């Protein structure tokens, strides 16, 4: 089934070239079917890239999905045009009255700052509190996961001695959970972060279950027992070249950065990396949409 997007969204042409089933709003409204309403709080600096990456995964499910893009009203983006934000994004006061079947809170390049020092932290906490009553299930990604764990459960983040950067293998801690249906016993996922959460802190919270871990990258996937809050410390949505672009960006800035682990063929940055995580990324999003959003949301919100 298709993902429904605004008619002129730049990601539409890219997705159609990749054979992703997309449908503009005019055609979608003519179908007699209850679509899922998903809101994406996009905190990534390169918003158009993040849009394409997430829509690619949302569009690979058998469910029709309506997407609303949300941005912080208390932060001015320096890397996305004002025209793009005004045309395709809304702000929280305009949607706080609505109910959504699902929400995605993306990562953000602010992980080395204390949460309370982030310019839009107060607004983000208001949104995260709102998800408790107005969203069936919320998927938090990377820094978004750390922010969610901190706000909802008081779990802190810790600086890493070296950036967690590369493609890492993960194992399943719980094999009979719906979110991991169809997963191999070992799967790969990109990580790109300077901070971490500790397993022992999460295990102290009886309302949380650790679903997947990596020997090198640590805790990967955590879920609240009611499925309303999902926390993902990696970036399954990343393109094959995203880590390469981040690596080259940091090199150009003279920042201390190591070659992404298990990423370039033979650790040679001149060779094109392969996407070895795509299938499980798609499976994760399909499982989330089906079992945690579609199966749990009411047909008509009260």
Curated annotation (Swiss-Prot):
CDD domains: GATase1_HTS. The record marks 192 as: Important for substrate specificity. InterPro entries: Class_I_gatase-like, HST_MetA, MetA_family. It comes from Geobacillus sp. (strain WCH70). It catalyses: L-homoserine + acetyl-CoA = O-acetyl-L-homoserine + CoA. Transfers an acetyl group from acetyl-CoA to L-homoserine, forming acetyl-L-homoserine. Gene3D superfamilies: 3.40.50.880. Coiled coil: none annotated. Substrate binds at residues 163, 192, 249. This is Homoserine O-acetyltransferase. The record marks 111 as: Important for acyl-CoA specificity. One of its GO terms (cellular component) is cytoplasm. The lineage of its organism: Bacteria, Bacillati, Bacillota, Bacilli, Bacillales. GO terms for molecular function: homoserine O-acetyltransferase activity; homoserine O-succinyltransferase activity. It is found in: Cytoplasm.
């Amino acid at each position: 089934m298709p993902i429904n997007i605004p008619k002129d969204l730049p990601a539409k042409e890219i997705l159609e070239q990749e054979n992703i089933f997309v449908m503009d709003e005019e055609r979608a409204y003519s179908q007699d079917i209850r679509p899922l309403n998903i809101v994406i709080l996009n905190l990534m600096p390169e918003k158009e890239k993040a849009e394409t990456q997430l829509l690619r995964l949302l569009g690979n499910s058998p469910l029709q999905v309506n997407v609303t893009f949300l941005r912080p009203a208390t932060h001015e983006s320096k890397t996305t045009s004002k025209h793009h934000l005004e045309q395709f994004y809304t702000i929280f006061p305009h949607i706080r009255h609505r109910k959504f079947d699902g929400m995605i809170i993306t990562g953000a390049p602010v992980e080395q700052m204390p949460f309370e020092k982030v310019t839009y932290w107060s607004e983000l906490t208001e949104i995260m509190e709102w998800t408790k009553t107005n969203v069936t299930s919320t998927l938090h990604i990377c820094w978004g996961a750390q922010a969610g764990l901190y706000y909802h459960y008081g779990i802190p983040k810790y600086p890493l001695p070296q950036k967690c950067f590369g493609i890492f293998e993960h194992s399943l801690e719980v094999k009979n959970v719906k979110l991991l249906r169809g997963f191999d016993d070992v799967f790969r996922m990109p990580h790109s972060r300077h901070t971490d959460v500790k397993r022992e802190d999460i295990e102290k919270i009886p309302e949380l279950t650790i679903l997947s871990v990596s020997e090198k990258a640590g805790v990967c996937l955590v879920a609240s027992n009611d499925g309303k809050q999902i926390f993902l410390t990696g970036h399954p949505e990343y393109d094959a070249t995203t880590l390469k672009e981040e690596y080259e960006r940091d090199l150009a800035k003279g920042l201390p950065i190591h070659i992404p682990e298990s990423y370039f063929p033979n650790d040679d940055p001149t060779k094109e990396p392969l996407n070895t995580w795509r299938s499980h990324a798609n499976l994760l999003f399909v499982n989330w949409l089906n079992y945690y959003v579609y199966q749990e949301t009411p047909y008509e919100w009260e």
